[in-house]
């Protein structure tokens, strides 16, 4: 509706029965009419992938490698493509951030992630997501700054694969600001020229920052809010 889709993220511990997990996904699809489900944790991937009631629902997961996909009759060496399955490719984020910051021995990973496009399911490439740094913070911070979360900066990932371009956090130094803008352009170039489906976090298109907070789920304030007036600057 209105040219947007709504997906819900569901986390499974692996202790639920496969039937319960399947029923939960079906419930969200048929009762709330979500367009897709991002499966986190330990979901029964093969059961959900082969569920005929979910055949028209986008299912995103960290990996579909363990899912058996039938061969095509026309091309026996290829697996039948399941258009509703998408891999949430965190490997792209890690490898391309390391490329962006100039880590050694990354050419092979650059080629792999740029060309990767499995025949059986789609790949969703991204440089930032809801659980981590925004793209602006990716080029502004080398350390997380989650003090405002009230957990003594212990929450959130310590592995962010980022480079601050010479200064940690906000700065007015012209050369640093220019370098960060250049790095953002490089990041978008890597994203859009790679095979698969590009995805970017809302606000990254205008340089939104969470002040280095990479776990802002609990911040219902300026840290997590988007200032759409930045589109005009």
Q: Which positions does each model-derived feature cover?
A:
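Glycine-rich beta-strand-to-loop/alpha-helix junction loops that act as flexible
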Residues: 41, 62, 204
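Extended hydrophobic/aromatic segments used for targeting, binding, or gating
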Residues: 210-233
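Short acidic/histidine-rich active-site segments
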Residues: 201-206, 210
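The substrate-binding groove and active-site-proximal loops of carbohydrate-active enzymes
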Residues: 7-19, 33-43, 96-99, 166-179, ...
